A protein has these predicted regions:
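Short phosphate-binding loop-to-helix
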Residues: 2-55
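Conserved core of the sugar-phosphate nucleotidyltransferase
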Residues: 42-127, 135-138, 142, 156-164
Length: 164
């Protein structure tokens, strides 16, 4: 980690929201992008599209996402959240579920937040590129071993996923 100049932060095990809150307070940013560790196949072009949409929108929304509703495969989730919105909401969050799943509060209370969703042209919401189980891990491992898989377009990746 030091060799590659990557910052590592560890915080509360049970209160992920608090972990993010402390990290945000240590860094000066207007937005942060949330990508979960169980998503090793994340697509950089999805991140870039969300950034492009936010810029075109002049950063008027509080959350830019591709999961509300989900149209991309599970495991390709990207959420860009306004830090002020995130920090102000902390006092309102009572349920431990929302403290562990840090954006669930915003989606449950979507009517109070400005959310913009980036939709896939094709609905791939039934595809799972996420690693939540040993079976998921083994499937992703098989996918990664396929020559050139990581450089393929999403449609090709989905077709390969369906074939194994």
């Amino acid at each position: 980690i030091d060799k590659n100049n990557i910052k590592l932060y560890r915080g509360s095990l049970n209160n992920v929201y608090l972990r993010y809150k402390k990290l945000i307070n240590e860094n000066n940013c207007d937005y942060f992008i949330r990508i979960c560790a169980d998503s090793p196949l994340i697509e950089v072009n999805i991140i870039n599209q969300i950034l492009k949409i936010a810029k075109k929108n002049k950063f008027q929304k509080e959350i830019y996402t591709n999961i509300f509703p989900r149209t991309f495969p599970k495991g390709l989730s990207v959420e860009m959240i306004n830090t002020n919105t995130f920090l102000k909401s902390y006092k309102k969050i009572r349920l431990n579920y929302h403290k562990e799943h840090i954006t669930s509060y915003f989606y449950k209370n979507y009517m109070y937040f400005k959310i913009l969703n980036y939709k896939s042209v094709v609905d791939y919401s039934d595809i799972n590129f996420s690693i939540d189980t040993k079976n998921d891990f083994n499937k992703v491992k098989r996918l990664i071993k396929i020559k050139g898989f990581l450089k393929k377009k999403l449609k090709e990746k989905v077709n390969i996923y369906k074939s194994i």
